[in-house]
Amino acid sequence: MYHQVLDKPDKLGKYVISPRELEEDLRLLDSLGYETVTVRDLIDFCDGKRKLPQKPIMLTFDDGYQTDYINVFPLLRQYNMRAVFSVVGSYTEKYSQENIDKHINYAHLSWDEIREMYESGLCEFQNHSYNLHSLERRHGCLKINGESNEQNRLRTLS
């Protein structure tokens, strides 16, 4: 699983790798005979609708950074490999707006970029939640201590 692929040495670390490092990974996987699969491929395999390659591997990218379009997508095309991107809905909405600052360190994919990547046949998109790890308010449908059934129903369905 990858997070951000960024060509900024001062930002590299646990969750950020360089395009060169990603290309090394892709080259190695290719040389060892691995074939990329998607979540759809795996579901179809489990449903008995398809076979998996001899050496399947799933490349996943979390959060949907714009660097997926800038740095990852060209490498996927170059190596003819597929990947799964889990995007955060609220970030995609935000960065699809006109006149928004798209700084390479933190910008996320727009709907147009997602569409282009998806239409290539190399990229599958999944949901990584709407607000990511937002702790601003409680989520879920379990009752809060002291909450009536009616209060819970109104809170969770509104």
Tell where the protein language model's regions lie, with residue ranges.
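Membrane-embedded segments
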Residues: 54, 60, 68-71
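Short, solvent-exposed loop/turn elements at domain surfaces
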Residues: 7-12
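C-terminal domain-boundary segment and adjacent tail
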Residues: 17-51
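Metal-dependent polysaccharide deacetylase catalytic core of the NodB/CE4 family, i.e.
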Residues: 5-6, 55-57, 77-158
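Extracytoplasmic/secreted proteins, especially bacterial periplasmic and envelope-associated proteins
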Residues: 21-24, 41, 67, 71, ...
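Alpha-helical scaffold elements within enzyme catalytic domains, especially in hydrolases
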Residues: 21, 26-28, 75-78, 116
